[in-house]
């Protein structure tokens, strides 16, 4: 396995957090193991890494019940077809995925839209799955236009995905630092959650919110009108962070004339 898996025992639930290697900026697929099934959250940029997460999940000896895609960025849905189960997403996220169209891998290979279009709408609210309470909330603004936040209140777990990165450079291509700061503030105001699952990086705890806030504050200060200068400045500020290529991807949106 090229990726790594971190296992968290939460009583009736076990969390298996698959994290891709640094070449795809430590993107995560969360495998939520309930008594009789597995709920998968997000599907990787590279299908090969999705295959690793799926092979691990199958080793648990329980069927994968569904795949939930949290937002409309390809590093979270390109591998969706590999799971072979219904793909769930917020209606607005599905619309955004459709608007993006076919996905092109770094190799040039094209993944047709039909392979990853969600087919089941996630309705915000509470759903009990295999005896486990899941709370689904829609969050607007920040890292993406819309994101799904998943809470497991009985286990004290927040599946924040790309609302939170852990020691990985932040993708700012949505050009909404203020919205992201507000989303993180809302997460930080939650009580009773000691485990936070990040969309990039290892599982963490509430202490990650201060880290994300600090990075966003620094990014706002360092962002000017030159993408290369911003990248150098933020990498110098956070030399240990993984995934500086994320900055290049974001800069194409932030500075389209110069990239």
What kind of region is each of these model predictions?
Residues 2, 189-191, 202-259:
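Accessory terminal helices/loops
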Residues 39-42, 66-68, 135-136:
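Short catalytic-loop micro-motif centered on adjacent basic/acidic residues
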Residues 36-37, 62-65, 86, 132-133, ...:
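Loop/turn elements at helix/coil->beta-strand transitions in domains of secreted/extracellular proteins
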Residues 45-47, 133-214, 218:
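Metallo-beta-lactamase
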Residues 32, 42, 57, 71, ...:
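Divalent metal-coordination and catalytic microenvironments
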Residues 20-22, 117-119, 138-141:
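Short Gly/Pro-enriched turn/cap motifs at secondary-structure boundaries
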Residues 55-126:
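Active-site HxH/HxHxD metal-binding segment of metal-dependent hydrolases
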Residues 5-55, 149-162:
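Conserved beta-strand hairpin/beta-sheet module of binuclear metal-dependent hydrolase folds
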């Amino acid at each position: 396995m090229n990726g790594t898996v971190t296992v968290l025992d939460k009583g009736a639930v076990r969390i298996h957090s698959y994290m891709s290697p640094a070449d795809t900026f430590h993107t995560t697929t969360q495998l939520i193991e309930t008594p009789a099934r597995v709920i998968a959250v997000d599907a990787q940029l590279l299908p090969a890494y999705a295959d690793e997460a799926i092979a691990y999940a199958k080793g648990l000896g329980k069927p994968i019940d569904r795949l939930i895609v949290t937002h409309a960025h390809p590093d979270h849905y390109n591998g969706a077809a590999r799971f072979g189960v219904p793909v769930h997403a917020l209606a607005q996220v599905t619309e955004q995925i459709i608007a993006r169209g076919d996905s092109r891998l770094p190799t040039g290979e094209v993944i047709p839209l039909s392979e990853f279009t969600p087919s089941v709408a996630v309705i915000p609210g509470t759903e009990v799955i295999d005896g486990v309470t899941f709370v689904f909330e829609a969050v607007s603004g920040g890292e993406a236009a819309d994101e799904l936040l998943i809470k497991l209140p009985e286990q004290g777990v927040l599946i924040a995905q790309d609302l939170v990165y852990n020691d990985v450079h932040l993708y700012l291509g949505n050009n909404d630092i203020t919205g992201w700061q507000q989303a993180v503030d809302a997460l930080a105001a939650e009580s009773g959650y000691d485990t936070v699952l990040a969309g990039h990086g290892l599982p963490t705890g509430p202490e990650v919110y201060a880290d994300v806030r600090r990075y966003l504050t620094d990014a706002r200060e360092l962002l000017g009108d030159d993408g290369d200068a911003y990248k150098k400045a933020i990498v110098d500020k956070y030399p240990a962070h993984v995934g500086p290529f994320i900055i290049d991807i974001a800069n194409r949106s932030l500075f389209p004339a110069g990239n």
